Swiss-Prot record:
Subcellular location: Plastid, Chloroplast thylakoid membrane
Membrane topology per record: Single-pass membrane protein
InterPro entries: PSII_Assembly/Photoprotect-Rel
Protein name: Light-harvesting complex-like protein OHP2, chloroplastic
Induction summary: Induced by exposure to high light.
Organism, scientific name: Arabidopsis thaliana (Mouse-ear cress)
Domain of life: Eukaryota
Membrane-crossing segments per the record: 136-156
Gene null: resulting phenotype: High light sensitivity leading to stunted growth with pale-green leaves on agar plates, but unable to grow on soil.
Amino acid sequence: MSVASPIQCIRILNPSSSSSSSTASSSFRFSTTTKPCVFIIRCSQTEGPLRRPSAPPTLREPQKPVPPSQPSSSPPPSPPPQKAVAVDGKSVTTVEFQRQKAKELQEYFKQKKLEAAGQGPFFGFQPKNEISNGRWAMFGFAVGMLTEYATGSDLVDQVKILLSNFGILDLE
């Protein structure tokens, strides 16, 4: 059971008093505590469906294309990746260090996946195979039940009809 507190104050401002603006503003105050909570509801005078407000267009000047420089005979040597740099007593990780660690982690998990695939029985009761087999069995059972309902012949008769129709057995 919930106890609802009475609304002590609702204040609605008359939108016709401010004719200079195109939007109406209403203020509701539900003060049940010492600290009042004020809600302001604004509505526009436009009609039609609700629309998401659009962002103002950004003004960018088009950049002039930079002519490509002449390629040198040898590419500049890449700097060795830095592990961590201490700046004002704080440890800063570089992008190259993160990239190198990400590649190492990818290789580690690839290797671990290959090792896990190599272990275990090739044939036998594996959970993934058992789930798949169970789903196929339930699907076949559901199809058999629907066929029995539609044709009136039971599951054993359906198997006999299938075997005779495919020419595997002559049961008639």
